[in-house]
Regions:
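Flexible, glycine/charged-enriched surface loops at secondary-structure junctions
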Residues: 99-101, 243-248, 295, 326-333, ...
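Long, contiguous, secondary-structure-rich segments that constitute the structural scaffold
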Residues: 465, 471, 475-543, 630-648, ...
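N-terminal export/assembly segments and adjacent metallocofactor-ligating motifs
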Residues: 1-240, 277, 361, 365, ...
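Catalytic, metal-anchored helix/loop core of enzyme active sites in primary metabolism
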Residues: 432
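Extended redox/cofactor-interaction regions of prokaryotic respiratory oxidoreductases
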Residues: 117-193, 199-204, 228-231, 317-429, ...
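Glycine/threonine-rich phosphate-binding loop and adjacent beta-strand/alpha-helix elements that clamp
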Residues: 441-468, 478, 483, 487-488
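Active-site phosphate/pyrophosphate-binding segments
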Residues: 233, 251-372
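Flexible glycine/proline-enriched surface loops and loop-helix/loop-strand junctions
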Residues: 171-173, 214-215, 264-268, 297-302, ...
Length: 758
């Protein structure tokens, strides 16, 4: 058999690894998916998720034509009718109510689809909407700290794992996540190299995760206590005279206030709350501060909790006060060949936070978006400006948002809903129209947002693997078609206007954009078979390494990138971006932002109220290597194997409430209850229960046959939307207090104190 191998960017996580997709041209079937050995970042590494491209293409449940709701059923319609109906529906909502009656929700895949990122900006110009996205679920505390500490929502510090000697990871499982907000493909090998050169990996996590198993030391803290541990370390560093901001000393403000705040969380006080001895906390602080090159990093476990902003802030401060910020081996700020697409600095003294507030709860915006919890209450609450129409793009908030039953009820309350999605799932079943984009392998691909978080400055372009079929539309075309109809503009003109507006917003971050050239002129000169490709070309030509329309003949362009099918690597992160890149009003790193210091009062209240006590279970999540949120549970080659939607419990807790592995338990929180199978393991400590998210039982109207046959429970029925992080209002998926009881098991000994049903 003669096959053809196509280079491809894996679209399933932030590492954006390089793949080789081997195809039989005659049958148009995928024969093999493997790692691309020539990819300059992943270098042949591949994880199981990559194999999902085959199942995703062949999935019989995948939608291939638009669906229109008729009563409780859906029927297929053609694209022109679908887009006309979608635009007419939103216009009708606006006419009956107000222009502020539309909401927009975008899910995680948006960040993996470069044209969709650009298209959403154009759509918001045609249909202003209250915008919530999945960033408020897993990133808001990170972004808020970036704003107040560094002055820019886009300044995300990335651990320099390849050159560090001491990697301290809070609430992160990079062996499974492949690195989150930390683009470092093949992390197993990078960690082995760290340890081979004499470095240490320390993991702070309530569960003995896959990463914790290979760590030099694992601190099994109580869920939700990351901020307490980091503050105790800060106090030790200050009190023992170990603090040193290095070359950035003159560019740091608030050190005295930080020292005073941390002094209230000395190791002796914090130890019983965290579950780590005071001596070990102090020793960890000494080891971290004395390492020649150290970095503290945190992700979802520390970020997605009720004290997420405090945790991220305190962990970042560890890097600053030990001279490990913006230094080789520390926390660094990539300056990629592409512009910082999340660039949002202070403007005239105003941070990109709180410039306006929502109607109902007066929740402050962050970077122009609002927390998803604010979106649901805007749908529920009557009055002028109530959200009555909603567009959901590649998201499944019924499975991914806290208090999931409230989310589903809010969707039922809408007058009109459109979903751009490839499945009839737990969320899209509520829609009036479902608009499915074509197979990912039929479109070109380009790394964009992830370049801003990569440990090596890598840029890649992938040609389409398969030809399009008649009637196929990609995400860009769907959104542009909807926007044109909403604005009453010729589609080609709307596309051009959207492209020009997008490039104008990028221009400040394009150092080689000719001063005497307009964005319209640049687009006219650009190459590419589609408008998104022409945008890529302009960005590449005018970025840091660009050829600037002939001024630098050896520079970068789309054509040059296409001639290097595995991508181009411009080297590792470079130190020295600070202090020039600090965007706070006084151009100093603000280690004691008043907003975060004020949130310590809420932490004190939680301590006093027994939040860290032992009178309830603490629920945490967990990742699986063969899954990503709810994306992959309907893909045969990834969903096979043992059941994954189980509740990990410590054997001592199981004995106390009278269950064994495989028994059903009822887990109950303030907002809901689910029944799930127990799996006993000493991976979690006493009082901790771990359930993954993205699973669901079959709901009326949804069509995910494999996922529903495998079953599972929606853990987000348990997570409390009112327990959100205080300063950012980001969602809390870890350290949710719950009670546990047996369900119909002969092993039950009756209710126990921990786990008693309420």
């Amino acid at each position: 058999m003669s096959t053809v191998a196509y280079p491809r960017i894996c679209p399933f996580c932030e590492s954006a690894c390089g793949l080789k997709v081997e195809v039989d041209p005659g049958s148009a079937q995928i024969i093999k998916i493997s790692g691309d050995p020539d990819h300059p970042l992943s270098r042949g590494f591949v994880c199981p998720k990559s194999q999902g491209l085959r199942s995703l293409r062949d999935d019989p449940d995948r939608l291939r034509k638009p669906l229109l709701r008729e009563g409780t059923e859906f029927r297929e319609i053609e694209w022109d009718e679908a887009l006309e109906r979608a635009a007419a529906g939103f216009k009708s909502v606006i006419e009956r109510h107000t222009p502020s009656s539309i909401g927009l929700y975008t899910g995680n895949p948006q960040a993996h689809i470069a044209p969709l990122q650009m298209a959403v900006a154009g759509l918001l110009g045609a249909m202003p909407a209250l915008y919530a996205n999945s960033g408020s679920i897993d990133c808001y505390p990170r972004f808020l700290v970036d704003v107040y500490l560094y002055g820019n929502l886009g300044h995300v510090p990335v651990p320099d794992i390849d050159r560090t000697d001491f990697f301290l990871a809070f609430g992160a499982n990079p062996l499974v996540s492949n690195g989150s907000m930390f683009g470092a493909s093949n992390l197993p090998q990078r960690i082995r190299k760290l340890q081979a050169r004499g470095g240490k990996l320390i993991v702070v996590d309530p569960r003995r995760t896959e990463t914790a198993r290979v760590a030099d030391e694992h601190f099994a803290i109580r869920p939700g206590s990351d901020a307490l541990l980091a503050l105790a370390m800060i106090d030790t560093i200050f009190s023992e005279g170990l603090a040193n901001c290095g070359r950035l000393t003159a560019s740091v403000s608030g050190l005295d206030d930080l020292r005073t705040a941390a002094a209230n969380y000395d190791a002796d006080r914090v130890a019983p709350l965290v579950g780590v001895s005071a001596d070990r906390i102090r020793q960890l602080a000494r080891e971290f501060s004395s390492a020649s090159r150290a970095v503290a990093y945190c992700r979802v476990g520390a970020n997605c909790q009720t004290f997420g902003s405090l945790a991220v802030w305190a962990i970042d401060c560890l890097n600053i006060i030990t001279a490990n910020l913006d230094e080789i081996g520390g926390a660094m700020f990539p300056a990629g060949v592409l512009p910082q697409f999340m660039n949002a600095p202070y403007i005239d003294g105003q941070p990109p936070h709180g410039r306006w507030r929502t109607r109902v709860s007066k929740t402050p915006e962050l970077g122009g978006t609002v927390p998803t919890t604010a979106l649901w209450e805007e749908i529920e609450t009557a009055g002028k400006g109530q959200i009555r129409g909603l567009l959901v793009i590649c998201g499944n908030p019924v499975l991914s948002n806290p208090n999931a039953e409230r989310v589903a009820a809010a969707l039922d309350d809408l007058e009109f809903m459109v979903a751009i999605d490839i499945y009839l799932n737990e969320t899209t079943r509520h829609a009036d129209l479902i608009l499915p984009p074509m197979d990912h392998l039929k479109r070109t691909d380009f790394t964009m947002i992830w370049n801003n978080w990569m440990v090596e400055d890598t840029v890649c372009y992938s040609p389409a693997t398969f030809p399009r079929d008649p009637g196929d539309l990609d995400d860009w075309e769907i959104v542009m078609g909807l926007g044109a109809r909403l604005s009453g503009t010729d589609p080609a003109r709307f596309e051009r206007q959207s492209a020009e507006a997008y490039l104008a917003s990028c221009r400040p971050g394009l150092p080689r954009f000719p001063e005497d050239m307009t964005v319209s002129e640049a687009l006219d000169l650009a190459s590419g078979d589609s408008m998104p490709e022409r945008i890529y070309d302009v960005i590449l030509r005018t970025g840091r390494e660009g050829e600037a329309f002939g001024a630098y003949p050896e520079g970068l362009s789309l054509q040059r990138l296409q001639q290097t099918p595995s991508g181009i690597n411009f080297g590792p992160m470079r130190p020295g971006r600070m202090p020039a890149a600090i965007d706070t009003p006084d151009r100093r790193l603000a280690v004691a932002p008043p907003l975060l210091l004020a949130d310590l009062d809420r932490l004190e209240t939680a301590i006093a109220d027994g939040f860290y006590g032992d009178n309830h279970f603490m629920l945490i999540g967990r990742r699986h290597l063969r899954s990503n949120n709810s994306w992959m549970h309907n893909l045969q080659n990834l969903a096979k194997g043992p059941a994954r939607c189980t509740a990990l419990m410590n054997p001592a807790d199981a004995e106390r409430i009278g269950i064994v592995s495989g028994d059903s338990i009822r887990v109950r929180s303030r907002v809901g209850a689910i029944v799930v199978s127990a799996e006993l393991s000493d991976e979690v400590g006493v009082g901790v229960i771990s359930i993954p998210h993205g699973f669901s039982r079959e709901l009326p109207g949804s069509k995910l046959n494999l996922a529903h046959r495998l079953g599972g429970a929606n853990v987000n029925i348990l997570h409390d939307d009112m327990a959100a992080d205080g300063p950012s209002r980001g969602a809390a998926f870890n350290a949710t207090p719950v009670d546990v009881e047996p369900v119909g098991t002969r092993h039950a000994k009756g209710d126990q104190r921990r786990g008693q049903a309420q």
